[in-house]
């Protein structure tokens, strides 16, 4: 396999996008630590910005540098709730979601309940003064405050009911309230300035109560849908971990994907709040699962898979290979970690960006179409989140992949030692000088000092405080009956007596601070530092710091452990044996030294502690019979499942193949012939043995690469196709292509399906020939056919019994079941149905003395030439025909029509009859059938009956008419070898892979038609070469090879 990765040939836009992505990824991967730190710090700063605006106080109105700003009356209505009372509600309070602006003539019956929260020990003495000062102002009336409405014992509350139309004037009037003492006054605090370092707990408690309230009043269907959405989201996350585990990472890559997504969401939320786009927390709670389900984690998985594929191609599964014609320096440059990431981006970057653009475009369209709805706001947030996620994928996550590959390279044998010997200062593909390290240390220390200086600087908070205060999330709505129960009760009594419908808007309590001669008393109770420091003092801030500390410790430990991997070679040899999954396979012919006695290795194997067993020790266990050769895959899979290292099932199977090769090479009875198998040119790496295990082959020691060509294109039933052919016979594909060209000149080939039914013929034994004859009569009767068909059809959705053919030989009875099998070739399907049908025959037909000699009595007849298949057909019965113009026969086939007709009669008809041929009235149909069978994963043995073919030619109006009739074509598009990746790709080439979505069996029938058309092309070209006398010359020119050489 050529390890050189070739770049695609993209179009203009794709080329420019890929080039830009290469530059971005290359820069990020060559400075991984910088990229990780900048991303983490940016996300942390944005996270604190969101917390600052949402939960905590910036107190910009209380700071000595604050500017006087006009009162934003509308902001005090955030979180308010309106209730109504009247005859329509049977004089009971109910939540009223209508607009708060009343209709004309009803303003007197729309009240606002305002609670003033006044701090300070002297407030009790000032309450009479305040009541007299504020009562009657703009129609305000004092009501009895609700008990426990104050947040702390040293706070007092005053409640007023104000006509809603006078609310603006009332709030402006109470912005500053004088105290009974001349030096004291209360100043109104903006809703955005509420809170303290303890407000996060209050916010969480309020959010929990609000959540319970919404759950209590929500519809059951809504709760079920939301629950299912979160369940599906969690399943998506679990699927991410499973896929990453399959790719070789148990935890860290999947966790990095989730961390990158969390960073993207935090940054997107920060941008959204900065743009003054309100974010509805309820819609956010409901919408995030659908965003995760819609977008998923396919793009990070796609990039990860591409990176691993490129690294595998360049490093050759642990052995660095130098491609032919490339110098060692070029190879070394191609194998640098950043270059690997860039090559992966060349392959998949454009497709990932295209997917991102489509998703972002759809979300942006939703934001534009619904700019004032919560759905539009969520689309705005989701679009920004996806855009930032795309940026982080090619920077932050690409850097994580770079670190992962670097650790893998360091831990691989010879990785760090060889690199250090030639490039002692190369890290992440970037040459690092000692002076650069010194500068990096100085910058780190200087940045640390600068951060602390900014934390203590008022200028920092003056700038950042004004910026952070703009991004807030809407608060939780107030509970009217909890905050203003007494006021609502008084209004209720008045409205009930007067009989007027009344609406009341309950505002959240207005927070005040007590100032004395310009000194903020409340401010002295706060922490010394505002801004970011408050965020760090909050419980969530502490949790984030602890999480960052844990991640830092784990990452440093991982990197230090990787660096130590090669520091102590002897310790590494004991910790990572030669048989580990990252090691280079051992040589079977090299002298081996067993480090442990056989008894110890056997004990480890029996006690399920075989993780430390090396390849050589496992080979010795195989040779001593402690591990059966056929069960190596199961044994290695069990060892991998209990391993502490991340070992995939595919890696376990590949290791099993490697060990089996070594065991076969060392088997004493065959060592004189098989000793070179382990180091032979038979390949075994880079193959998906998971598909082979339990399905296609046992005792696997590798795979055979078979040359694959395509003939055509050929027009078959109006559709042009390339026909894949796997063969080692020269001229075959070229000859078929010439036949395709000639057939296309006449309009292409036409095919017909004459029959579709697979057969199985069991052999039954009876006590006497008379009982066998009675059984035959019962099977051929309508009752017998009905019983057998019912039992047979119940075994499969696709198997449907068509006909029963019965033959008797003495006491033996042969029944040939013919049935449809869908898109499968169907031998297993029909065997299961025959077994059940015979059970029904013995039980319901009255033949308990019947004995099944064999399920296949050669009356099928399977994998052998038989007249019953030639006459009655088996599998698909297909005919393909074409008409070739006389001019094409002369120009392309280099012969004439009459010569071809005569040759076909003399050779294919008379000659085959003289030889007593059975189904062999053709030139070389088996050649074409077998080549297509091997290419598409069909059963090679069934080439025997599938190649039964008669070729006919006739001169019609001077043109050549040619046809092939093949009564027993046995093919399928599911099961067997069609599950292998390469063979499945060839079925994709023909458009017939898998089961047909709407018409069962259509893909298999189409494949049979294609094989018959390929035989038609091969027959035409070969007969023409024979007629023109070119066959020998063609084979001498194209089918001659030099003697085989053995690579040393």
UniProtKB/Swiss-Prot annotation:
UniProt: NADP(+) binding residues? 796-798, 823-831, 1039-1040
Q: Which residues lie on this side of the membrane: Lumenal?
A: 54-220, 272-276, 370-377, 461-542
Pathway this chain belongs to:
Metabolic intermediate biosynthesis; (R)-mevalonate biosynthesis; (R)-mevalonate from acetyl-CoA: step 3/3
Membrane topology designation: Multi-pass membrane protein
Q: Which GO terms describe its biological process?
A: coenzyme A metabolic process; ergosterol biosynthetic process; isoprenoid biosynthetic process
- What GO MF terms are annotated? hydroxymethylglutaryl-CoA reductase (NADPH) activity
The record describes the protein's role as: HMG-CoA reductase; part of the first module of ergosterol biosynthesis pathway that includes the early steps of the pathway, conserved across all eukaryotes, and which results in the formation of mevalonate from acetyl-coenzyme A (acetyl-CoA). In this module, the cytosolic acetyl-CoA acetyltransferase catalyzes the formation of acetoacetyl-CoA. The hydroxymethylglutaryl-CoA synthase then condenses acetyl-CoA with acetoacetyl-CoA to form HMG-CoA. The rate-limiting step of the early module is the reduction to mevalonate by the 3-hydroxy-3-methylglutaryl-coenzyme A (HMG-CoA) reductase.
Quote the PANTHER family the UniProt record gives.
Answer: 3-HYDROXY-3-METHYLGLUTARYL-COENZYME A REDUCTASE
Give the protein name, as stated in the record. 3-hydroxy-3-methylglutaryl-coenzyme A reductase
The opening ranks of the lineage are: Eukaryota, Fungi, Dikarya, Ascomycota, Pezizomycotina
């Amino acid at each position: 396999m050529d390890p050189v990765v070739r770049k695609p040939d993209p179009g203009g836009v794709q080329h420019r996008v890929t080039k830009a992505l290469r530059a971005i990824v290359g820069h990020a991967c060559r400075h991984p630590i910088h990229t990780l730190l900048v991303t983490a710090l940016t996300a942390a700063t944005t996270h604190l910005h969101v917390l600052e605006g949402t939960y905590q106080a910036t107190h910009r109105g209380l700071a000595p540098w604050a500017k006087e700003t006009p009162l934003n009356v509308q902001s005090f209505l955030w979180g308010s709730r309106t209730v109504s009372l009247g005859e329509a509600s049977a004089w009971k309070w109910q939540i009223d979601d209508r607009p708060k602006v009343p209709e004309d003539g009803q303003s007197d019956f729309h009240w606002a309940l305002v609670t003033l929260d006044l701090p300070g020990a002297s407030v009790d003495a000032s309450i009479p003064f305040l009541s007299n000062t504020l009562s009657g102002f703009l129609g305000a009336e004092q009501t009895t405050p609700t008990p426990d409405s104050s947040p702390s014992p040293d706070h007092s509350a005053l409640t007023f009911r104000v006509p809603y139309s006078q609310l603006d004037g009332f709030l402006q009037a109470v912005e500053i309230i004088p105290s009974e003492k001349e030096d004291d006054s209360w100043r109104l605090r903006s809703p955005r300035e509420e809170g303290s370092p303890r407000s996060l707990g209050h916010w969480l408690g309020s959010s929990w109560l609000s959540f319970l309230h919404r759950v209590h009043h929500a519809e059951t269907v809504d709760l079920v849908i939301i629950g299912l959405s979160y369940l599906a989201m969690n399943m998506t996350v679990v699927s991410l971990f499973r896929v990453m585990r399959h790719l070789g990472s148990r935890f860290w890559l999947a966790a990095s994907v989730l961390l990158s997504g969390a960073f993207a969401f935090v940054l997107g939320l920060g941008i959204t709040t900065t743009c003054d786009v309100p974010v509805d927390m309820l819609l956010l709670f409901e919408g995030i699962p659908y965003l995760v389900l819609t977008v998923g984690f396919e793009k990070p998985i796609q990039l990860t898979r591409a990176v691993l594929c490129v690294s595998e191609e360049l490093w050759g599964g642990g052995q660095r290979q130098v491609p032919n014609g490339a110098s060692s320096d070029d190879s070394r440059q191609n194998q640098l970690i950043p270059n690997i990431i860039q090559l992966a981006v060349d392959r998949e970057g454009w497709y990932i960006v295209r997917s991102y653009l489509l998703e972002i475009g759809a979300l942006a369209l939703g934001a534009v179409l619904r700019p004032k709805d919560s759905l539009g706001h969520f689309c705005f947030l989701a679009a920004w989140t996806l855009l930032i996620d795309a940026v982080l994928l090619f920077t932050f996550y690409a850097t994580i992949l770079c670190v992962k590959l670097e650790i893998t390279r360091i831990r691989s044998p010879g990785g760090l030692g060889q690199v250090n010997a030639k490039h002692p200062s190369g890290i992440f593909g970037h040459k690092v000088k000692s002076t650069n390290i010194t500068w990096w240390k100085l910058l780190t220390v200087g940045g640390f000092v600068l951060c602390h200086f900014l934390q203590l600087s008022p200028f920092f908070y003056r700038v950042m405080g004004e910026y952070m205060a703009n991004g807030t999330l809407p608060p939780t709505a107030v509970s009217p009956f909890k905050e203003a129960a007494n006021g609502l009760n008084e209004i209720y009594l008045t409205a009930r007596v007067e009989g007027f419908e009344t609406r009341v808007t309950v505002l959240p309590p207005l927070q005040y601070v007590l100032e004395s001669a310009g000194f903020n008393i409340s401010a002295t109770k706060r922490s010394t530092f505002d801004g970011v420091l408050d965020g760090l003092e909050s419980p969530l801030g502490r949790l984030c710091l602890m999480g960052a500390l844990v991640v830092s410790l784990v990452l440093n430990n991982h990197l230090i452990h990787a660096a130590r991997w090669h520091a102590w070679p002897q310790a590494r040899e004991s910790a990572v044996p030669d048989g580990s999954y990252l090691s280079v396979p051992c040589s079977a012919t090299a002298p081996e030294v067993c480090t442990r006695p056989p008894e110890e290795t056997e004990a480890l194997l029996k006690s399920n502690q075989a993780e430390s067993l090396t390849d050589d020790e496992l080979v010795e266990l195989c040779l001593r019979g402690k591990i059966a050769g056929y069960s190596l895959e199961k044994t290695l899979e069990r060892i991998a499942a209990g391993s502490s290292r991340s070992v995939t099932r595919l890696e376990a199977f590949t290791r099993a193949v490697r060990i089996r090769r070594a065991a076969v090479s060392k088997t004493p009875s065959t060592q004189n012939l098989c000793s070179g198998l382990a180091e032979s040119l038979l390949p075994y790496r880079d193959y998906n043995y998971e598909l082979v295990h339990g399905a296609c082959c046992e005792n696997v020691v590798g795979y055979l690469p078979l040359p694959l060509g395509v003939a055509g294109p050929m027009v078959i039933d109006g559709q042009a196709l390339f026909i894949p052919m796997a063969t080692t016979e020269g001229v075959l594909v070229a000859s078929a292509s010439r036949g395709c060209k000639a057939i296309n000149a006449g309009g292409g080939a036409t095919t017909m399906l004459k029959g579709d039914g697979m057969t199985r013929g069991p052999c039954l034994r009876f006590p006497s020939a008379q009982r066998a004859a009675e059984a035959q009569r019962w099977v051929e009767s309508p009752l017998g056919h009905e019983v057998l068909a019912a039992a047979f059809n119940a075994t499969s959705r696709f198997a449907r019994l068509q006909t029963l053919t019965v033959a008797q030989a003495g006491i033996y009875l042969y029944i040939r079941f013919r049935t449809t099998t869908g898109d499968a070739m169907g031998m297993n399907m029909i065997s299961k149905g025959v077994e059940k049908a015979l059970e029904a025959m013995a039980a319901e037909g009255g033949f308990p003395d019947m004995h099944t000699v064999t399920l296949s009595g050669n009356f099928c007849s399977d994998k052998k030439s038989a007249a019953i298949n030639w006459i009655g057909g088996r599998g698909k019965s297909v005919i393909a025909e074409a008409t070739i113009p006389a001019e094409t026969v002369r120009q392309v086939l280099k012969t004439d029509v009459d010569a071809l007709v005569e040759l076909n009669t003399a050779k294919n008809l008379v000659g085959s009859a003289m030889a007593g041929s059975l189904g062999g009235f053709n030139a070389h149909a088996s050649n074409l059938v077998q080549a297509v069978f091997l290419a598409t994963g069909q059963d090679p043995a069934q080439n025997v009956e599938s190649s039964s073919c008669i070729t006919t030619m006739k001169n019609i109006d001077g043109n050549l008419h040619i046809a092939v009739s093949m009564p027993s074509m046995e093919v399928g598009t599911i099961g067997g070898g069609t599950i292998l990746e390469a063979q499945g790709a060839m079925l994709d080439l023909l458009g017939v892979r898998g089961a047909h979505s709407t018409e069962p069996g259509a893909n298999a029938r189409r494949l049979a038609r294609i094989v018959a058309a390929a035989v038609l092309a091969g027959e035409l070209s070969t007969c023409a070469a024979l007629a023109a006398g070119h066959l020998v010359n063609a084979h001498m020119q194209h089918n001659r090879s030099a003697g085989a050489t053995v690579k040393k």
